Amino acid sequence: MPLPVALQTRLAKRGILKHLEPEPEEEIIAEDYDDDPVDYEATRLEGLPPSWYKVFDPSCGLPYYWNVDTDLVSWLSPHDPNSVVTKSAKKLRSSNADAEEKLDRSHEKSDRGHEKSDRGHEKSDRSHEKSERNHEKSDRDRERGYDKVDRERERDRDRDRGYDKVDREESKERRHHRREELAPYPKSKKAASRKDEELDPMDPSSYSDAPRGTWSTGLPKRNEAKTGADTTAAGPLFQQRPYPSPGAVLRANAEASRTKQQD
C-alpha cells in the first residue's frame, strides 16, 4: 500500500525515505448534471449584465442567453439591439397547455351549466304540459257535464213534445168524432166521383186498355239510363204503330223470297 504523499515528504526530509513514489494521476471526469450547461467563461468575457448567462442548448447545439431571475431567454446577447427577450419554448408550451386546460375546464363548466339550465327548462316544460293536461281534463269533464245536462234537457223537451203530439192527436180525433155525430146526413161523394169522371180525351186510357196515368207518367226518370230505346212501347202510354215493326218486315220479305223460289 503506498504511503501518503505528505508522509513521504517528511520521511524524505529526515533521510529515512530516499525514493519518492510519484503521485498517481487521477483522471478527472467532468460530469454535467444540468440540462442547460452554463458557459461561465463566455459569460465573463462578453460582460453580460447581472443575472444573465450564456447557455448551450443541447437539442440544437446553439448558445442562447438566460436570465436566472426572470427566467427569460434570448438568442442574441442582451447588449444587441436586435435581441428579443421572451419566455422559453418549454415555458410557453406549458403555459399554453395550462391555458388550454383552463379554457377546457371553463367550457366544461359552462356546458354543465347549460345542461343544468336545459334540465330546468325541461322540468318546467313538463310541469307546464302536466298543468295543461290537467286543464284539458277539467275542461273535458266540464263539457261532459254540460253535454249530460243538455241531453237531459233535450230528453225532457222530446218527452214534452211527445206528450203534446199525443194530446193534439187525441183532441183531433175527438173533434172528428164530434163532427160525425153532429152531421145530419153523410158526406156526399160527389167531388170524388166528379174527379173520377174527368178524363182527358187524349189520354190513352180513354181509348185503349192502357191504365190511367198520372201527370208524371212518361216523363224521364232521374235514375233511368238513357239508352235511346222507346220505353213507351210497352208502357202505360202504348199506342198502335201505323206501320209494321222492323222484325215483321224482315219476316215478310223472307216469306216472299221463299214463295218465289217455290214457284
Swiss-Prot record:
<keyword id="KW-0399">Innate immunity</keyword>
<dbReference type="InterPro" id="IPR036020">
    <property type="entry name" value="WW_dom_sf"/>
</dbReference>
<dbReference type="GO" id="GO:0016607">
    <property type="term" value="C:nuclear speck"/>
</dbReference>
<feature type="repeat" description="3-5">
    <location>
        <begin position="158"/>
        <end position="159"/>
    </location>
</feature>
<protein>
    <recommendedName>
        <fullName>Polyglutamine-binding protein 1</fullName>
    </recommendedName>
</protein>
<feature type="repeat" description="1-5">
    <location>
        <begin position="132"/>
        <end position="138"/>
    </location>
</feature>
<dbReference type="GO" id="GO:0002218">
    <property type="term" value="P:activation of innate immune response"/>
</dbReference>
<dbReference type="GO" id="GO:0031175">
    <property type="term" value="P:neuron projection development"/>
</dbReference>
<keyword id="KW-0507">mRNA processing</keyword>
<feature type="repeat" description="3-3">
    <location>
        <begin position="154"/>
        <end position="155"/>
    </location>
</feature>
<comment type="subunit">
    <text>Interacts with POU3F2/Brn-2, ATXN1, TXNL4A, HTT and AR. Interaction with ATXN1 correlates positively with the length of the polyglutamine tract. Interacts with RNA polymerase II large subunit in a phosphorylation-dependent manner. Forms a ternary complex with ATXN1 mutant and phosphorylated RNA polymerase II. Interacts (via C-terminus) with TXNL4A and CD2BP2. Interacts (via WW domain) with ATN1 and SF3B1, and may interact with additional splice factors. Interacts (via WW domain) with WBP11; Leading to reduce interaction between PQBP1 and TXNL4A. Interacts with CAPRIN1. Interacts with DDX1.</text>
</comment>
<feature type="repeat" description="3-4">
    <location>
        <begin position="156"/>
        <end position="157"/>
    </location>
</feature>
<feature type="region of interest" description="5 X 7 AA approximate tandem repeats of D-R-[SG]-H-D-K-S">
    <location>
        <begin position="104"/>
        <end position="138"/>
    </location>
</feature>
<dbReference type="GO" id="GO:0032481">
    <property type="term" value="P:positive regulation of type I interferon production"/>
</dbReference>
<feature type="repeat" description="3-6">
    <location>
        <begin position="160"/>
        <end position="161"/>
    </location>
</feature>
<feature type="repeat" description="2-3">
    <location>
        <begin position="143"/>
        <end position="144"/>
    </location>
</feature>
<dbReference type="GO" id="GO:0003690">
    <property type="term" value="F:double-stranded DNA binding"/>
</dbReference>
<feature type="repeat" description="1-2">
    <location>
        <begin position="111"/>
        <end position="117"/>
    </location>
</feature>
<dbReference type="GO" id="GO:0005737">
    <property type="term" value="C:cytoplasm"/>
</dbReference>
<feature type="region of interest" description="Disordered">
    <location>
        <begin position="94"/>
        <end position="263"/>
    </location>
</feature>
<feature type="repeat" description="3-1">
    <location>
        <begin position="150"/>
        <end position="151"/>
    </location>
</feature>
<dbReference type="GO" id="GO:0051607">
    <property type="term" value="P:defense response to virus"/>
</dbReference>
<feature type="repeat" description="1-1">
    <location>
        <begin position="104"/>
        <end position="110"/>
    </location>
</feature>
<feature type="repeat" description="2-1">
    <location>
        <begin position="139"/>
        <end position="140"/>
    </location>
</feature>
<feature type="repeat" description="3-2">
    <location>
        <begin position="152"/>
        <end position="153"/>
    </location>
</feature>
<keyword id="KW-0804">Transcription</keyword>
<feature type="modified residue" description="Phosphoserine">
    <location>
        <position position="94"/>
    </location>
</feature>
<dbReference type="GO" id="GO:0002230">
    <property type="term" value="P:positive regulation of defense response to virus by host"/>
</dbReference>
<keyword id="KW-0539">Nucleus</keyword>
<keyword id="KW-0597">Phosphoprotein</keyword>
<feature type="compositionally biased region" description="Basic and acidic residues">
    <location>
        <begin position="99"/>
        <end position="173"/>
    </location>
</feature>
<feature type="modified residue" description="Phosphoserine">
    <location>
        <position position="245"/>
    </location>
</feature>
<feature type="region of interest" description="3 X 2 AA tandem repeats of [DE]-R">
    <location>
        <begin position="139"/>
        <end position="144"/>
    </location>
</feature>
<feature type="domain" description="WW">
    <location>
        <begin position="46"/>
        <end position="80"/>
    </location>
</feature>
<dbReference type="GO" id="GO:0043021">
    <property type="term" value="F:ribonucleoprotein complex binding"/>
</dbReference>
<dbReference type="GO" id="GO:0045087">
    <property type="term" value="P:innate immune response"/>
</dbReference>
<keyword id="KW-0805">Transcription regulation</keyword>
<comment type="function">
    <text>Intrinsically disordered protein that acts as a scaffold, and which is involved in different processes, such as pre-mRNA splicing, transcription regulation, innate immunity and neuron development. Interacts with splicing-related factors via the intrinsically disordered region and regulates alternative splicing of target pre-mRNA species. May suppress the ability of POU3F2 to transactivate the DRD1 gene in a POU3F2 dependent manner. Can activate transcription directly or via association with the transcription machinery. May be involved in ATXN1 mutant-induced cell death.</text>
</comment>
<feature type="region of interest" description="Important for interaction with TXNL4A">
    <location>
        <begin position="243"/>
        <end position="253"/>
    </location>
</feature>
<feature type="region of interest" description="6 X 2 AA tandem repeats of [DE]-R">
    <location>
        <begin position="150"/>
        <end position="161"/>
    </location>
</feature>
<keyword id="KW-0508">mRNA splicing</keyword>
<feature type="repeat" description="1-4">
    <location>
        <begin position="125"/>
        <end position="131"/>
    </location>
</feature>
